[in-house]
């Protein structure tokens, strides 16, 4: 019985990689079917289910709201359409940016649409749903070859990393790269120095306030939870900061689509969520997380696997 018999401190909805586009079904580079028009139906079912639950404090969308294959003259309308569907949830919705978001719209347009409270184009932020908890949302495309203007220092830094780490002409290809070096591809990104300092200060503040922390980011932060080609460029730097604090219990991500779960050497739970995009018609992938004082419990629907994160 234990905590399962008690009421959670709070609960929140989760969904990842909706990647809607008004185009025919296709396949990923690995040949996995993608159901571009159906994904909005997955989201609609998710919102209905979350509202029926009646006690979800908020929803987190783990990024990639619209797909990169969305015709560019439809990018703005498609993003607005999906945001409108999310806003049918009876509560706050927190978004983060993924690579597919940035293939469609520049940050200056995207952040206001998604109501991301960043400054100067930055998309990282934190909030406290209850006094006991802090939620941190990272911007995994802070250092990125997409989304910033071409002359922006973050674009230049990203292109330099790709030039140094990836010898392929196609910088989206990990061909010839081995193990975790496969992460140095254009569709991934990194967390910049300013954001690293911010993360450290937020975690220090949470620790001083005896708050537990849930870290969210579109791009996975551990080689144990996702494909080596779907990792944050500087996951090691981010995790070195996170591991300084006992307060961080869970790192949630999307991006890798197939889903994954891993507990690292410091006892931090990593969970990459199954993509809404890859649900055949009539199937679904979304869920909600019950947060207790001593554990978190992901209650998944259909293709999203339920997971207990025991502290």
UniProtKB/Swiss-Prot annotation:
Catalytic reaction annotation: CDP-choline + H2O = phosphocholine + CMP + 2 H(+); ADP-D-ribose + H2O = D-ribose 5-phosphate + AMP + 2 H(+); CDP-glycerol + H2O = sn-glycerol 3-phosphate + CMP + 2 H(+)
Keywords: Hydrolase, Metal-binding, Zinc
Tagged with keyword Nucleotide-binding: no
UniProt binding sites for Zn(2+) 1: 17, 19, 64, 257
A Pfam family of this chain: Metallophos
GO molecular function, one term: ADP-ribose diphosphatase activity
Gene3D superfamilies in the record: 3.60.21.10
Binding site for Zn(2+) 2: 64, 99, 218, 255
Subunit structure: Monomer.
Protein name as annotated: Manganese-dependent ADP-ribose/CDP-alcohol diphosphatase
């Amino acid at each position: 019985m234990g905590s399962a018999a008690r009421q959670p401190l709070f609960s929140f909805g989760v969904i990842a990689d909706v990647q809607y586009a008004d185009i025919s079904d296709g396949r990923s580079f690995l040949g996995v079917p993608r159901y571009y028009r159906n994904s909005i139906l997955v989201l609609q079912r998710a919102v209905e289910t979350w509202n029926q639950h009646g006690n979800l404090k908020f929803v987190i969308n783990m990024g990639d709201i619209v797909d990169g294959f969305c015709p560019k003259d439809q990018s703005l309308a498609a993003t607005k359409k999906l945001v409108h569907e999310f806003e049918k949830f009876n509560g706050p919705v927190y978004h983060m940016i993924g690579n597919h978001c940035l293939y469609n719209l520049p940050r200056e347009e995207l952040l206001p649409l998604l109501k991301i409270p960043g400054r100067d184009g930055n998309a990282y932020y934190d909030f406290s749903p209850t006094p006991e908890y802090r939620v941190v949302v990272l911007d995994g495309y802070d250092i990125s070859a997409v989304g910033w203007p071409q002359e922006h220092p973050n674009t230049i830094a990203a292109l330099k990393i790709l030039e140094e780490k990836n010898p392929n002409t196609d910088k989206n290809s990990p061909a010839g790269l081995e193990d975790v070096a496969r992460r140095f591809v254009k569709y991934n990104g990194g967390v910049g120095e300013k954001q690293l300092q911010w993360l450290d200060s937020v975690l220090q503040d949470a620790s001083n306030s005896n708050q537990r922390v849930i870290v969210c980011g579109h791009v996975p932060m551990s080689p144990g939870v996702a494909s080596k080609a779907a990792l944050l460029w500087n996951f090691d730097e981010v995790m070195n900061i996170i591991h300084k604090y006992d307060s961080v219990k869970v790192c949630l991500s999307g991006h890798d689509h197939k889903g994954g779960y891993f507990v690292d050497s410091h006892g931090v739970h990593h969970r990459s969520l199954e993509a809404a995009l890859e649900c055949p018609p009539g199937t679904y992938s979304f869920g909600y997380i019950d947060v207790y004082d001593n554990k978190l419990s992901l209650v998944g629907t259909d293709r999203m696997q339920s997971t207990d994160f025991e502290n």
